[in-house]
UniProtKB/Swiss-Prot annotation:
Species name: Catharanthus roseus (Madagascar periwinkle)
The name this protein goes by in its record: Tabersonine/lochnericine 19-hydroxylase
Stored CDD domains: CYP71-like (cd11072)
Tissue spec. comment: Confined to roots.
Enzyme superclass (EC): oxidoreductase
Protein family membership: Belongs to the cytochrome P450 family.
Length: 507
């Protein structure tokens, strides 16, 4: 019997050797086609190589491993894109293949199981949601209907600055700009100011906490069996509170708007009037074809609009004024352009603004150096695919480092310097057609909100340059600024913005 068993194993030995050889050959070949990758550690993968400022540490790694780099965040494969050419492959050439979103735990909790437009999976629901946002809420006609709101709130801001200047007070720029954007978007979305109601203060706190919460590291997203850590580090508690406060406020707003519209006989059928909530309620009531019936859609879309609008608009204003204060020669040139075009009149029209080429260049340059999303919202590969000669597996998360691309000296002369003149000689815009410059992303999953945010920033900066001379407070110099982007979903500055303003006597 023993002899028979020995003969049996001798006969099987070549078979096992062949299987082992084929496995090793397959394993070698598959690894050979993977993107370059730094060595990873057990359990945590490459998470130890991320700093407090991930866009910076990822750029440093890409300088060594290349513009298409494979990392592992825990057990999750993550492809990092750091060149315009690779970004074009992802967002244009293979746009549909990379059109999904990761199912982040925090996003699912706050956004009603991904019922919003930003994080919803690619498919029919997402197409319906995006169509409603683009055609009903962010169309040129709708945005133009909010012009009066924008002008009223900018005027109120200018009056506050003028009063502070008369008292020789230092102006808290972040507070001024946050109030401005919150009230413009509050009135546009809900028909009410955040700053004039008690419940609005709770929502302001939510809007302050939510973007960093969505963009912060959640260990459970990458190492699922460590999800219990969220109960120890306070993440779960904070997420519960933010979700609860947000839902209560949105429920109240929707109920109040529905009652008000019924009492007034409002008919917000896509005409020139109606805030976002009224428009959505009307579409729901009329059972418009393509309007999603899923519970939570209204709240999730409204949340998309206000979170995407308030924080990014306020931060862009922050960065524009910060860079102008640091670069006085740029501010002088911009003031000259604005004052020559507008003259002695108080109002600044859309026609005036269109003539301000240097203003447009200043805003574009601020967005180049400080994109609202330094790391674009990740995409997910929907299938196995070949990308620039590398094998990318289905389910791989894809991070596009827009911050690194916008500071790449291969595309930009003096890439770290604030030079608006570079945009006077090119036709780059915010549509994501030039992949060296993608502050709002590109392709199917790009952010459609630039048509709403940019006019607010343009008119605000134009009015400030026209009516005031602004400078740093006494004792503060440009060298004191360290414009470091903080961690989170959007690009916050760790340094508060303060300035003094002197009215210009040209009226």
């Amino acid at each position: 019997m023993l002899s028979s068993l020995k003969d049996f194993f001798v006969l099987l030995l070549p078979f096992f050797i062949g299987i082992a050889f084929i496995y090793k050959l397959w394993n070698f070949t598959s690894k050979k086609n993977l993107p370059p990758s730094p060595r990873r550690l057990p359990i945590i993968g490459n998470l130890h190589q991320l700093s407090k400022f991930p866009q910076r540490s990822l750029r440093t790694l890409s300088e060594k491993y290349g513009p298409v780099m494979l990392l592992h965040f825990g057990s999750k494969p993550v492809l990092v894109i750091s060149s315009a050419e690779a970004a074009k492959e992802v967002m244009k050439i293979n746009d549909v293949s990379f059109a999904d979103r990761p199912k982040w735990y925090a996003a699912g909790r706050v956004l009603y199981e991904f019922k919003d437009m930003t994080f919803s999976p690619y498919g029919e629901y997402w197409r319906q949601a995006r169509s409603i946002c683009v055609l009903q809420l962010l169309s040129n006609k709708r945005v133009q209907s909010f012009k009066g709101i924008r002008e009223e709130e900018i005027r109120a801001m200018l009056e506050k600055i003028n009063q502070a200047s008369n008292n020789s007070s230092i102006i808290n720029g972040d507070e001024i700009f946050s109030t401005l954007t919150n009230d413009i978007i509050g009135r546009s979305a809900f028909g009410r100011k955040f700053s004039e109601e008690e419940s609005g203060s709770k929502l302001r706190k939510v809007l302050q906490d939510l973007p960093p919460l969505l963009g912060s590291f959640n260990v459970g997203d990458f190492i699922p069996w460590l999800s219990w850590v969220n109960y120890l580090n306070g993440f779960e508690k904070k997420l519960n509170q933010v979700s609860k406060d947000c839902d209560q406020y949105l429920e109240q707003v929707i109920d109040d708007t529905r009652k008000r519209d019924e009492e007034n006989g409002a008919n917000n059928n896509g005409g020139n009037h109606g805030n976002f909530v009224s428009v959505l309620l009307h579409l729901q009531k009329e059972d418009v074809k393509g309007f999603p019936s899923e519970k939570g859609f209204l709240k999730a879309i409204i949340l998309d609009m206000i979170v995407g609008g308030t924080d990014t608009t306020h931060l862009l204003l922050h960065w524009v004024i910060t860079e102008l204060l640091k670069n006085k020669h740029v501010m002088t040139k911009l003031q000259k352009e604005v004052r020559e075009i507008v003259g002695r009149k108080w109002e600044i029209t859309d026609e005036d603004k269109e003539k301000m080429k240097y203003l447009h260049a200043v805003i574009k340059e601020a967005l180049r150096l400080h994109p609202s999303l330094p790391l674009l919202v990740p995409r997910v590969a929907r299938e196995d695919i070949n990308l620039m000669g590398y094998r990318v597996a289905k389910g791989t998360e894809v991070i596009i480092n827009a911050w690194a691309i916008a500071r790449d000296p291969s595309y930009w002369d003096e890439a770290e310097e604030f030079k608006p003149e570079r945009f006077l000689s090119n036709n780059f815009d915010f549509k994501g057609l030039n992949f060296e410059y993608i502050p709002f992303g590109s392709g199917r999953r790009s952010c459609p909100g630039s048509s709403f945010a940019i006019p607010i920033v343009e008119h605000t900066v134009a009015h400030l340059m026209h009516k005031f001379n602004i400078e740093l407070p006494n004792g503060v110099s440009a060298e004191d600024f360290d414009p470091t982007d903080a961690v989170g979903l959007v690009s916050h500055d760790q340094n508060p913005l303060s300035f003094v303003a002197t009215p210009v006597t040209i009226f």
